[in-house]
Amino acid sequence: MLQKSEVVVLTSINQEGYPRPVPMSMVKAEGISTVWMSTGNDSWKTVDFRKNPKGGLCFYAQGDSVCMTGDVEVITDADIKQELWQDWFINHFPGGPTDPNYVILKFEANHATYWIEGKFVHRKV
C-alpha cells in the first residue's frame, strides 16, 4: 500500500510541543517501516526533528490507512543525497544534489496502527 502512495503525512513536534503534520512526497520506502523524503535544511520540520526526532507518518489508499510512530533522522550525507535525487527537486534546490539547503528525512517506524479492510491492527514494527 505504501508503494501506491505518492504523498504521505509526516508529523513533527513543534517548538510549542504541538504536532505539526505536513504532506510530503515520498522519495523511497524500504518495506513499510523506513520512508525517505526530501526537504529544506531551513524548513520548520527539519528544525523540529533536530530538536526532537520523534515523529509520525500516515498514508492512505482506497479506504485503507496506516499510521506509524517512530524517529526521524536528518541526513546530509552527499552520497545518499545524490542517490535519492530526483529531477523535479531542482525546482526547490537550484544547486542540485549539492545544494546546501537540500537534506533527506529518514523516518524509521517503531509502532504501526493499520486500518485494513475494516479492521484495526496495532503492532510493533
What are these language model-derived features?
Residues 9, 34-36, 67, 113:
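General beta-strand recognition
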Residues 27-62:
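A short mixed-secondary-structure module that forms the rim of ligand-binding clefts
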Residues 67-125:
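Charged, gly/pro-rich active-site loop segments
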Residues 1-15, 55-58:
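A short, Trp-centered hydrophobic/proline-enriched beta-strand micro-motif
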Residues 24-27, 72-73:
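Hydrophobic/aromatic beta-strand elements that line small-molecule binding cavities or substrate pockets
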